[in-house]
């Protein structure tokens, strides 16, 4: 790399990548993002991630690095750790995991030996692949005892979880999900873990932003270890964080570095520090209130009689969180068809398996629809009511996709994304 290239903008050095980024910005601006695991990072977070911290190697932890010149990245990492602890009331935070999956894998390595038993929610019933999926490292290294939702309610029955834990005697119980629309009983999970001599690990990747806003029970006081991503409801960089009790600090830190990772991504850690600061603000809490309100408006519309007539329903009958799980098993549409139809209308969602789904994973019989990105964009009850009706109309036979797209266009124009940003 020459000095001249070092100082040239992306559009000059690589116009192909620059154009793809610009096109993606256009896509995000012109559509309604309703994938439950996605959000719009504040510009301050994007700037932190695009900073010169990208250049710095910093193996180790603040005050104990294996490279020189780390005095300023130490400041950044300490800010991120302290803010995470304060935000969630944790004894210790490790902000180095590159992703939520890395955080989860590190926790398992810290708390278990290969062959130990992990008990988590089945992937087919809303769990995450790192909670014991057979082809994931969690399913390869550990013995898995998966619990499921109840067939009548699609909810987790804690009495059943206790019965299974008493039989399986797991070393670790993980409470968390990727597709579940109700709050978990963390106190009950801890009681069960204590009864069977297990550690309780909570994966709050999806609902951490709701916890930070005080709108969802905080798992940290109940869990031995808590993990999260930072980019979902927290709207930070794509990355992970681990929170733990003080006596597990050394085990957790060692499992992350040198156990699984080398140099931390200091630009991402800077983005985490910024995101945690924003998450402590009243503006953030207000956004989370609109996030939940929007999901509940959506759930109410999708349980209306006109949709029920066409075989569309909502798992658990509603939601306590930021997402709605749509059941299409009795509909003319499968999950992929519904996802594609909504895409044509300008709404991005993801097809999702429902419990006991008869269709293959690439097709599915459901949709997972989330509201965080639209709340970040500024949507309130009025706009969520309109979006909910657009989705409802799209899922009924004979939908006029062009007319629905016009309604979506009106919303995106009313709430511009990253205004003033002409070129990225």
Swiss-Prot record:
Enzyme class: transferase
Compartments, as annotated in UniProt: Cytoplasm
The protein's required cofactors: pyridoxal 5'-phosphate
Predominant location: cytoplasm
Keyword Ribosomal protein assigned: no
Protein name in the entry: Serine hydroxymethyltransferase
Pfam family, any one: SHMT
Taxonomic source organism: Kocuria rhizophila (strain ATCC 9341 / DSM 348 / NBRC 103217 / DC2201)
Any one of the GO CC terms: cytosol
Subunit text: Homodimer.
Any GO MF annotation of the entry: pyridoxal phosphate binding
Domain of life of the native organism: Bacteria
SUPFAM superfamilies linked to this entry: PLP-dependent transferases (SSF53383)
Cited Gene3D superfamilies: Aspartate Aminotransferase, domain 1, Type I PLP-dependent aspartate aminotransferase-like (Major domain)
Keyword terms, alphabetized: Amino-acid biosynthesis, Cytoplasm, One-carbon metabolism, Pyridoxal phosphate, Transferase
PTM-bearing positions, type N6-(pyridoxal phosphate)lysine: 232
Enzymatic reactions: (6R)-5,10-methylene-5,6,7,8-tetrahydrofolate + glycine + H2O = (6S)-5,6,7,8-tetrahydrofolate + L-serine
């Amino acid at each position: 790399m020459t000095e001249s290239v070092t100082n040239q903008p992306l559009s000059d050095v690589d116009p192909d990548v620059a154009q793809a980024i610009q096109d993606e910005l256009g896509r995000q601006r012109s559509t309604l993002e309703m994938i439950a695991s996605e959000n719009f990072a504040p510009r301050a977070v994007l700037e932190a991630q695009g900073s010169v911290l990208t250049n710095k190697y910093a193996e180790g932890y603040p005050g104990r690095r294996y490279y020189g010149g780390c005095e300023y990245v130490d400041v950044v990492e300490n800010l991120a750790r302290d803010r995470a602890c304060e935000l969630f009331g944790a004894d210790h935070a490790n902000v180095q995991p590159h992703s939520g999956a890395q955080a989860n894998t590190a926790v398992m390595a810290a708390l278990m030996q290969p062959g130990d038993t992990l008990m988590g929610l089945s992937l087919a019933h809303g769990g995450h692949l790192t909670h014991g999926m057979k082809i994931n490292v969690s399913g390869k290294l550990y013995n898995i005892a998966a619990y499921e939702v109840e067939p009548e309610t699609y909810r987790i029955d804690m009495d059943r979880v206790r019965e299974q834990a008493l039989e399986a005697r797991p070393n670790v119980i993980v409470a968390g999900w990727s597709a579940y629309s109700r709050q978990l009983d963390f106190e009950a999970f801890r009681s069960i873990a204590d009864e069977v001599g297990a550690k309780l690990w909570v994966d709050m990747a999806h609902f951490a932003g709701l916890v930070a806003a005080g709108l969802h029970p905080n798992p940290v006081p109940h869990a031995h270890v808590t993990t999260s991503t930072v980019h979902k409801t927290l709207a930070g960089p794509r990355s992970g964080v681990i929170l733990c009790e003080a006596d597990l600090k050394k085990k957790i830190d060692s499992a992350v570095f040198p156990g699984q990772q080398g140099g931390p991504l200091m630009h991402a850690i800077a983005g985490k520090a910024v995101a945690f600061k924003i998450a402590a603000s009243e503006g953030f809490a207000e956004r989370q209130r609109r996030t939940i309100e929007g999901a509940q408006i959506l759930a109410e519309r999708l349980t209306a009689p006109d949709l029920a007539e066409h075989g569309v329903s909502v798992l658990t009958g509603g939601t306590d969180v930021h997402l709605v799980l749509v059941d299409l098993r009795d509909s003319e549409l499968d999950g992929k068809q519904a996802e594609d139809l909504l895409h044509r209308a300008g709404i991005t969602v993801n097809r999702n398996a429902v419990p006991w789904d008869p269709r293959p994973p690439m097709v599915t019989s459901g949709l997972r629809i989330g509201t965080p990105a639209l709340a970040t964009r500024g949507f309130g009850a009025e706009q969520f009511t309109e979006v909910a009706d657009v989705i409802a109309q799209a899922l009924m036979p004979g939908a006029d996709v062009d007319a629905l797209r016009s309604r979506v266009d009106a919303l995106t124009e009313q709430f511009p994304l990253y205004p003033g940003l002409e070129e990225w």
